[in-house]
Design a protein with these regions (language model features):
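Short intrinsically disordered coil segments
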Residues: 74-79, 282-289
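Topology signature of small-to-medium multi-pass alpha-helical membrane proteins
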Residues: 1-158
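Alpha-helical scaffold elements within enzyme catalytic domains, especially in hydrolases
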Residues: 229-233, 253, 291
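Conserved acetyl-CoA-binding loop-helix of GNAT-fold acetyltransferases
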Residues: 220-232, 242-243
Length: 356
């Protein structure tokens, strides 16, 4: 019975690994080969079934022959996937328990007086509990170990703000950024830099995606090659790159790289030196502006660096505005003293000189 239970457990574990095998995860390949060899061994012990054992060895050989096919280092942790695998494995364990009881009962009715190996329903229940404990434990261990491995080995997790800002400063001395580049200094993103193609992107992981803010910065003549390189880098760890807010002039590069598009909105830029409110269109705006100025409100732009007193005032305003909510970050920015001190600050003060 030990070999029978072990064979069942190994089969369920291989079923669990099927998703990771399909995803070409390197660790799944190693475990699968080990489980197949053990399965072949216990199949022989269970009933000296040479045909089944040979078939498992053939499958093992195919795995070994396709070793290079499994190239991914890791996969993103997902509670949904973990729970789904636990439910699927439990379904098969319950199916084993009830079908085993039914088969034994039918066999006993046909062959009265024959002693059965599992003579009572409790034997199947006890076996199911044991198998559940082992298989579910394996699922939890498998996912948590991968999560721990990711924390230790994902290359971007070791990046510090100083490292990111130095890399960004260096590339911006040669190439211009875009309207979103300054948000990288908010410190809530990681970067990927290609020294070969002289390009850089800022991104943040979310579920199985690496969300990239804007277009790559640097030598845009190498953009297509860089997009391919970054996709291969993300794919190595089981992620998919997603680009947020890209420039229209680069759409052909993204299209040729196989990306699909989803329009969320449009962006408008205004040349301030040519901007005027003298028209019927801005009548309501002028009225509001004049009323605020009459009430003592004043708009001004302060050059950096800013005093600690000013920073503390705007931090108070920021906290009052947020309330119990959290900072959005990413493309919307967040309150960060170092980030604020990197650029001019636009403020509105009331008649008492307080920032509102």
């Amino acid at each position: 019975q030990f070999s029978q239970k072990t064979t069942l457990i190994l089969g369920l574990m291989l079923l669990i690994l099927s998703y990771e095998i399909r995803m070409k995860i390197r660790k799944a390949y190693i475990l699968s080969v080990a489980f197949l060899i053990l399965g072949s061994l216990f199949t022989l012990i269970k009933g000296f079934n040479i045909e089944e054992s040979f078939l498992l060895l053939v499958i093992t050989g195919i795995f070994i022959f396709t070793k290079d096919y499994f190239y991914r280092i890791a996969f993103p942790f997902s509670w949904t996937k973990l729970i789904k695998q636990m439910l699927i494995s439990e379904f098969f364990i319950i199916l084993y328990m009830f079908s085993g009881q039914k088969i034994d009962y039918s066999f006993y009715k046909l062959h009265k007086g024959v002693e059965l190996l599992n003579s009572t329903p409790n034997d199947y229940i006890n076996n199911a509990i044991l198998i559940t404990f082992i298989v579910q434990g394996f699922i939890i261990f498998w996912h948590l170990s991968n999560w721990y491995f990711s924390l230790k080995n994902l290359p971007w997790l070791s990046q510090t703000k100083e490292y990111i800002f130095n890399k960004l400063d260096k590339i911006l001395t040669v190439y211009s950024g875009n309207v979103l580049t300054h948000l990288i200094y908010s410190g809530d993103k990681y970067i990927y830099e290609s020294e070969k193609y002289n390009l850089l992107v800022a991104f943040r992981p979310f579920q199985k995606n690496l969300i990239v803010l804007g277009d790559p910065i640097g030598e845009t003549n190498n953009l297509f090659e860089f997009l391919e390189e970054f996709r291969e880098f993300a794919d190595l760890y089981g992620y998919i790159p997603v680009y947020y807010q890209v420039n229209e002039k680069y759409l052909s590069y993204y299209h040729d790289s196989g990306y699909t598009f989803f329009k969320l909105g449009e962006e408008a830029l205004i040349e301030l030196k040519n901007f005027s409110t003298v028209s019927k269109t801005f009548r309501g705006f002028r009225s509001t502006k004049n009323k605020l100025e009459k009430d003592g409100y004043n708009f001004s732009v302060l050059k950096e660096p800013h005093t600690d007193e000013l920073i503390n005032q705007i931090e108070k305003v920021s906290k009052e505005w947020l309330g119990d909510k959290k900072e959005k970050g990413f493309s919307l920015g967040s309150f960060d003293k170092d980030y604020i001190n990197r650029s001019p600050l636009a403020i509105i003060t009331d008649s008492n000189g307080q920032i509102t």
